[in-house]
Amino acid sequence: MSPFQSLLWTGSQLRLLDQRSLPQETQYRYYDTAAGVAQAIQDMVVRGAPAIGVAAAFGLVLTSQQSAMTDSADLRAQLAIAAETLKAARPTAVNLAWAVDRMLAAIANPDLEAAAIHATLLAAAQQLYDEDVAVNRQIGLNAQALIPQQANVIHHCNTGALATVDYGTALGIIRIAHEQGKQIHAYLDETRPRLQGANLSAFELQAYGVPHTVIVDGASGFLMRQQQIDCCLVGCDRVTANGDVANKIGTYNLALAAKAHGVPFYVACPISTIDRSLATGAEIEIEERDGREITEIRGQAIAPAGTKTWNPAFDITPAELVTAIITERGILYPPYGQALEQVLINPG
């Protein structure tokens, strides 16, 4: 396991590492209600598509454990309300809704009594937790076929252990390459406006001893022109049926720069991030956040009072800019419509 854990179930509470305070301070916060977990997701105490899905799963466990309902129908109604609250916390990441729906499916049997619902939900949440570690590690192992023995890569946002239960997706690829003895150097986009690259990815890679350099988001194209970059590695929050990718704002710009310079652009994600119910990225709901994330840094104003802002948290990268999608079931190549359908049908 990593030297830090983004989330941990204590037996009665969900402990979250408050990522807003990193790297300056390591603070843990404890939650005992689904509403509290939903607020933590919205406030980005915990972030990253896989991590918020697992956090939401334990949010339902908390609702069940604290419920005074002895009638199973009443308990299910209470859980349904909590589920909608959790899903609404961050609408772009499909893993959040996927994890909540999987939890509800686990208790779909109408014959389950209240006590059995409690036990089933806890087991289902723990299974999600354990699966996430195994899935992320497999993504990292599968990707090594694309990473040369000596590699310079560009990474956007944070997709490591802090964004998941452990290892992570795109950053996990870098971590595993380093563990395997590859000479890998990561250039980390700082990732405005919340600086997940500078604050979180640099924090992780420093802990693992992986050589890295932080760059401003606008420097990636010039960096590709100035020196050899072997690939760009990003995670994602949703992949649509045609292979369009929703990821942290700035991903689209990076993909355009990579295309212009002939640099492979790889997206790493678990199968749970694939949403074939949406035909293209145009159908994805994009979360817009408070403009103060742009006009302030850690509470300090950096723009004139009253400045207008537009602050989408994510953007859409068209499938034609994506060289490959790396999953726990293998590496997918265009045409993505066919590849995504096949990987969902055939687990092997």
UniProtKB/Swiss-Prot annotation:
Q: What are the recorded GO MF terms, alphabetically? A: S-methyl-5-thioribose-1-phosphate isomerase activity
Q: Which UniProt keywords apply?
A: Amino-acid biosynthesis, Isomerase, Methionine biosynthesis
Does the record's keyword annotation contain Transferase? no
Its pathway is: Amino-acid biosynthesis; L-methionine biosynthesis via salvage pathway; L-methionine from S-methyl-5-thio-alpha-D-ribose 1-phosphate: step 1/6
Q: What class of enzyme is it?
A: isomerase
User: Looking at the record's lineage, which domain of life comes first?
Assistant: Bacteria
The EC number(s) given in the record are: 5.3.1.23
Q: Where is this site: Transition state stabilizer?
A: C157
Listed under catalytic activity are: 5-(methylsulfanyl)-alpha-D-ribose 1-phosphate = 5-(methylsulfanyl)-D-ribulose 1-phosphate
Active site positions, chain numbering:
D237 (proton donor)
Q: Which residues bind substrate?
A: R47, G48, A49, R90, Q196, N247, K248
Q: Could you mention a single GO BP entry for this protein?
A: L-methionine salvage from methylthioadenosine
* Family to which this protein belongs: Belongs to the eIF-2B alpha/beta/delta subunits family. MtnA subfamily.
Briefly state the protein's biological role.
Catalyzes the interconversion of methylthioribose-1-phosphate (MTR-1-P) into methylthioribulose-1-phosphate (MTRu-1-P).
Provide the protein name: Methylthioribose-1-phosphate isomerase
Which species is listed as the source?
Answer: Synechococcus elongatus (strain ATCC 33912 / PCC 7942 / FACHB-805)
Supply the source organism's classification.
Answer: Bacteria, Bacillati, Cyanobacteriota, Cyanophyceae, Synechococcales
Q: What's the name of its gene?
A: mtnA
